[in-house]
Regions:
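Basic, flexible linker segments flanking DNA-binding modules
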Residues: 1-53, 118, 125-128, 204-207
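Generic alpha-helical structural context detector
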Residues: 12-16, 132-135, 158, 188
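RNase H-like DDE/DDD metal-dependent nuclease/strand-transfer catalytic core used by mobile genetic elements
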Residues: 5, 40-64, 70-178
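Short, surface-exposed recognition loops or helix-turn segments adjacent to catalytic cores
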Residues: 13, 28, 144-149, 176-179, ...
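Active-site-proximal acidic segments at structured loop/helix or strand boundaries
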Residues: 161-207
Length: 207
Protein backbone atom coordinates (compact mmCIF):
# COMPACT_ATOMS: atom_id res chain seq x y z
CA UNK A 1 0.00 0.00 0.00
CA UNK A 2 2.82 2.43 0.86
CA UNK A 3 5.36 0.92 -1.51
CA UNK A 4 7.44 -0.51 1.35
CA UNK A 5 8.77 -4.04 0.93
CA UNK A 6 10.45 -5.47 4.05
CA UNK A 7 11.27 -9.02 4.99
CA UNK A 8 9.68 -10.65 8.04
CA UNK A 9 13.06 -10.67 9.78
CA UNK A 10 13.49 -6.95 9.18
CA UNK A 11 9.99 -6.14 10.47
CA UNK A 12 10.61 -8.31 13.53
CA UNK A 13 13.89 -6.51 14.25
CA UNK A 14 12.20 -3.10 13.97
CA UNK A 15 9.44 -4.24 16.34
CA UNK A 16 11.99 -5.61 18.83
CA UNK A 17 13.95 -2.34 18.77
CA UNK A 18 10.72 -0.39 19.31
CA UNK A 19 9.68 -2.63 22.19
CA UNK A 20 6.64 -4.08 20.40
CA UNK A 21 8.02 -7.61 20.13
CA UNK A 22 9.75 -9.83 22.68
CA UNK A 23 11.78 -12.73 21.27
CA UNK A 24 10.52 -16.10 22.49
CA UNK A 25 13.75 -16.85 24.37
CA UNK A 26 13.40 -13.61 26.33
CA UNK A 27 9.75 -14.09 27.27
CA UNK A 28 9.10 -14.95 30.91
CA UNK A 29 7.83 -18.49 31.44
CA UNK A 30 4.10 -18.87 31.75
CA UNK A 31 2.99 -19.46 35.31
CA UNK A 32 0.22 -22.04 35.56
CA UNK A 33 -1.68 -21.62 38.79
CA UNK A 34 -2.57 -24.97 40.34
CA UNK A 35 -6.26 -25.73 40.03
CA UNK A 36 -8.08 -26.38 43.29
CA UNK A 37 -8.92 -29.99 43.96
CA UNK A 38 -12.51 -31.11 43.57
CA UNK A 39 -14.38 -31.64 46.82
CA UNK A 40 -15.56 -35.25 46.51
CA UNK A 41 -14.13 -38.62 45.67
CA UNK A 42 -15.32 -39.58 42.19
CA UNK A 43 -16.23 -36.05 41.15
CA UNK A 44 -13.36 -35.84 38.66
CA UNK A 45 -10.86 -38.53 37.71
CA UNK A 46 -7.78 -37.66 35.68
CA UNK A 47 -6.67 -40.33 33.21
CA UNK A 48 -3.53 -40.71 31.13
CA UNK A 49 -1.26 -43.26 29.50
CA UNK A 50 2.42 -43.36 30.43
CA UNK A 51 4.74 -45.05 27.93
CA UNK A 52 7.88 -46.13 29.78
CA UNK A 53 10.43 -48.90 30.31
CA UNK A 54 8.46 -50.16 33.29
CA UNK A 55 10.43 -53.39 33.45
CA UNK A 56 13.73 -51.68 32.66
CA UNK A 57 15.85 -54.10 30.59
CA UNK A 58 13.86 -57.18 31.64
CA UNK A 59 11.09 -56.69 29.05
CA UNK A 60 10.07 -54.27 26.29
CA UNK A 61 8.62 -50.87 27.15
CA UNK A 62 4.84 -50.68 27.46
CA UNK A 63 2.12 -48.26 28.54
CA UNK A 64 0.57 -47.86 31.97
CA UNK A 65 -2.95 -46.42 32.03
CA UNK A 66 -3.29 -44.30 35.16
CA UNK A 67 -6.55 -43.14 36.78
CA UNK A 68 -6.14 -40.61 39.62
CA UNK A 69 -8.95 -39.14 41.69
CA UNK A 70 -8.70 -35.36 41.67
CA UNK A 71 -10.08 -34.73 45.16
CA UNK A 72 -7.83 -37.16 47.02
CA UNK A 73 -4.91 -37.98 44.75
CA UNK A 74 -5.84 -41.64 45.14
CA UNK A 75 -4.75 -44.15 42.53
CA UNK A 76 -8.05 -45.59 41.34
CA UNK A 77 -6.97 -47.79 38.44
CA UNK A 78 -3.69 -49.00 36.93
CA UNK A 79 -3.48 -51.17 33.84
CA UNK A 80 -0.39 -52.21 31.90
CA UNK A 81 -1.10 -52.49 28.16
CA UNK A 82 1.07 -52.77 25.03
CA UNK A 83 0.08 -49.29 23.86
CA UNK A 84 -2.46 -46.54 24.51
CA UNK A 85 -5.59 -47.40 22.52
CA UNK A 86 -9.36 -47.21 22.60
CA UNK A 87 -9.66 -50.89 23.50
CA UNK A 88 -7.15 -50.50 26.32
CA UNK A 89 -9.17 -47.64 27.82
CA UNK A 90 -12.36 -49.68 27.44
CA UNK A 91 -10.77 -52.47 29.47
CA UNK A 92 -9.38 -50.14 32.15
CA UNK A 93 -12.60 -48.13 32.44
CA UNK A 94 -14.74 -51.24 32.74
CA UNK A 95 -12.52 -52.48 35.58
CA UNK A 96 -12.75 -49.03 37.20
CA UNK A 97 -16.56 -48.94 37.08
CA UNK A 98 -16.86 -52.50 38.37
CA UNK A 99 -14.67 -51.65 41.38
CA UNK A 100 -15.73 -48.10 42.21
CA UNK A 101 -18.87 -47.23 40.27
CA UNK A 102 -19.22 -44.46 37.69
CA UNK A 103 -17.40 -41.18 38.38
CA UNK A 104 -18.97 -37.86 37.46
CA UNK A 105 -16.28 -37.08 34.87
CA UNK A 106 -13.01 -38.20 33.34
CA UNK A 107 -10.36 -35.57 32.56
CA UNK A 108 -7.88 -36.42 29.80
CA UNK A 109 -5.61 -34.91 27.19
CA UNK A 110 -6.71 -34.41 23.57
CA UNK A 111 -5.39 -37.70 22.25
CA UNK A 112 -7.39 -39.33 19.47
CA UNK A 113 -8.95 -41.79 21.90
CA UNK A 114 -10.75 -38.93 23.62
CA UNK A 115 -11.27 -36.19 21.06
CA UNK A 116 -12.13 -36.19 17.37
CA UNK A 117 -10.31 -33.95 14.92
CA UNK A 118 -11.80 -30.90 13.21
CA UNK A 119 -12.65 -32.76 9.98
CA UNK A 120 -14.55 -35.51 11.78
CA UNK A 121 -16.39 -32.88 13.79
CA UNK A 122 -17.40 -31.07 10.60
CA UNK A 123 -18.78 -34.37 9.29
CA UNK A 124 -21.06 -34.59 12.29
CA UNK A 125 -19.22 -37.29 14.21
CA UNK A 126 -19.31 -35.68 17.62
CA UNK A 127 -17.80 -38.51 19.67
CA UNK A 128 -14.94 -40.93 19.53
CA UNK A 129 -15.77 -44.56 20.34
CA UNK A 130 -14.57 -44.00 23.89
CA UNK A 131 -16.48 -40.73 24.16
CA UNK A 132 -19.66 -42.41 22.95
CA UNK A 133 -19.25 -45.14 25.58
CA UNK A 134 -18.84 -42.52 28.32
CA UNK A 135 -21.91 -40.68 27.02
CA UNK A 136 -23.95 -43.88 27.26
CA UNK A 137 -22.68 -44.37 30.82
CA UNK A 138 -23.55 -40.75 31.69
CA UNK A 139 -19.91 -39.93 32.48
CA UNK A 140 -18.70 -36.51 31.35
CA UNK A 141 -15.55 -36.42 29.22
CA UNK A 142 -13.40 -33.31 29.67
CA UNK A 143 -10.22 -32.56 27.71
CA UNK A 144 -7.37 -30.44 29.04
CA UNK A 145 -5.82 -27.78 26.82
CA UNK A 146 -2.34 -28.23 28.33
CA UNK A 147 -0.43 -30.91 30.18
CA UNK A 148 -0.23 -28.51 33.14
CA UNK A 149 -4.02 -28.50 33.37
CA UNK A 150 -4.01 -32.20 34.22
CA UNK A 151 -0.99 -31.82 36.42
CA UNK A 152 -2.03 -34.35 39.07
CA UNK A 153 -1.94 -37.31 36.73
CA UNK A 154 1.19 -35.97 34.99
CA UNK A 155 2.98 -35.74 38.34
CA UNK A 156 1.69 -39.16 39.30
CA UNK A 157 3.23 -40.59 36.14
CA UNK A 158 6.61 -39.27 37.26
CA UNK A 159 6.16 -40.72 40.75
CA UNK A 160 5.20 -44.11 39.35
CA UNK A 161 8.11 -44.14 36.93
CA UNK A 162 10.33 -43.99 39.99
CA UNK A 163 8.48 -45.77 42.80
CA UNK A 164 6.59 -48.44 40.85
CA UNK A 165 9.59 -49.33 38.70
CA UNK A 166 11.60 -50.00 41.87
CA UNK A 167 8.83 -52.16 43.34
CA UNK A 168 8.57 -54.21 40.14
CA UNK A 169 12.32 -54.74 40.19
CA UNK A 170 12.36 -55.80 43.84
CA UNK A 171 9.63 -58.36 43.17
CA UNK A 172 11.19 -59.67 39.97
CA UNK A 173 8.10 -58.74 37.97
CA UNK A 174 8.88 -58.70 34.26
CA UNK A 175 5.56 -59.04 32.43
CA UNK A 176 2.39 -57.01 32.02
CA UNK A 177 0.28 -59.88 33.37
CA UNK A 178 2.30 -60.14 36.57
CA UNK A 179 2.41 -56.35 36.94
CA UNK A 180 -1.37 -56.10 36.57
CA UNK A 181 -1.81 -58.78 39.22
CA UNK A 182 0.40 -56.74 41.57
CA UNK A 183 -1.26 -53.39 40.77
CA UNK A 184 -4.05 -53.70 43.36
CA UNK A 185 -1.55 -54.36 46.14
CA UNK A 186 0.58 -51.42 45.05
CA UNK A 187 -2.40 -49.06 44.86
CA UNK A 188 -3.66 -50.04 48.31
CA UNK A 189 -0.26 -49.40 49.89
CA UNK A 190 0.28 -46.16 47.95
CA UNK A 191 -3.14 -44.76 48.83
CA UNK A 192 -2.79 -45.64 52.50
CA UNK A 193 0.42 -43.64 52.62
CA UNK A 194 -0.19 -40.69 50.31
CA UNK A 195 -3.90 -40.13 49.57
CA UNK A 196 -5.43 -36.94 50.95
CA UNK A 197 -8.71 -36.51 52.80
CA UNK A 198 -11.31 -34.85 50.53
CA UNK A 199 -13.09 -31.67 51.60
CA UNK A 200 -16.37 -33.57 51.53
CA UNK A 201 -16.94 -37.15 52.68
CA UNK A 202 -19.59 -37.66 49.97
CA UNK A 203 -18.67 -40.31 47.40
CA UNK A 204 -19.74 -39.00 43.98
CA UNK A 205 -19.50 -42.40 42.27
CA UNK A 206 -22.77 -43.83 41.02
CA UNK A 207 -23.84 -47.47 40.53
Amino acid sequence: RHGIDLSKACVRRIMIDAGFWVPRKQRPPKVHQPRNRRACLGELVQIDGSDHAWFEDRAPACTLLVYVDDATGRLMQLLFVPTESTQAYFTATRAYVERHGKPQAFYSDKAGVFRINARENAEGRGYTQFGRALFELNIDSLCANTSQAKGRVERMNGVLQDRLVKELRLRGISSMAAANAYALTFMADFNARFAKVPRSDFDAHRP
